[in-house]
């Protein structure tokens, strides 16, 4: 991952990975790659962004995390994403093993025994691709997760997606058009944490008063 390879009960806040290329080459079913973290269990992600990244793996690939594994035996609780987004990311998985796994998603490639909660977040313009495996059910793409394993569920609260090439595993998120992402509609729905910036919403930072200060100085 761009921030960490492995997270266990960790909290990651105010982090962005932009214009990066990440690749995981180990060819087995534990191969994970994501813009922020490769493998996470019980992680808390807040105000994190992944933009214009290229993720390549040989099993699990995600815009944020390659695999989210919240097995109750670990005792660290379920993962959450709040005020997060992925935009313009290309995520691909290509296994050399015909019995292998090839799963990619806008937030996570694989969810294992997870009740993932995603709040006030979105996925936009995700290019998702899988190759190589001949096993039905383990070659898949999805908006927020490529594949849900075991008792995994996605709980969305005020979430959106668009231009992902799929509607699978979107939970209860609402699909929006490219125009709605570009014209400020989605930014308004996401509230004060976001502001329109170019073609899609980005985090709303401190106000810039430099022009006001300059005028007062005159």
For each predicted feature, which ranges?
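Predominantly extracellular beta-rich ligand-binding scaffolds that present long acidic/polar faces
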Residues: 1-218
């Amino acid at each position: 991952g761009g921030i960490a390879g492995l997270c266990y009960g960790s909290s990651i806040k105010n982090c962005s990975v932009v214009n990066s290329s990440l690749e995981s080459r180990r060819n087995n079913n534990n191969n994970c790659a994501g813009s922020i973290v490769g493998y996470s269990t019980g992680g808390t992600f807040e105000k994190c962004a992944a933009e214009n990244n290229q993720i390549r793996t040989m099993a699990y690939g995600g815009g944020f995390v390659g695999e989210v594994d919240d097995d109750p035996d670990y005792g660290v609780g379920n993962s959450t994403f709040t005020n997060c987004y992925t935009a313009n990311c290309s995520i691909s998985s290509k296994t050399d093993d015909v019995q292998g796994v090839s799963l990619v998603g806008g937030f996570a490639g694989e969810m294992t025994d997870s009740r993932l909660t995603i709040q006030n977040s979105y996925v936009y313009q995700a290019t998702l691709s899988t190759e190589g495996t001949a096993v039905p059910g383990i070659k898949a793409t999805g908006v927020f997760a490529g594949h849900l394993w075991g008792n995994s569920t996605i709980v969305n609260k005020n979430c959106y997606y668009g231009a992902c090439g799929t509607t699978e595993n979107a939970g209860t998120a609402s699909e929006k058009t490219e125009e709605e992402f570009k014209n400020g509609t989605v930014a308004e729905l996401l509230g004060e944490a976001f502001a329109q910036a170019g073609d899609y919403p980005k985090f709303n930072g401190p106000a810039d008063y430099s022009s006001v200060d300059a005028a007062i100085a005159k």
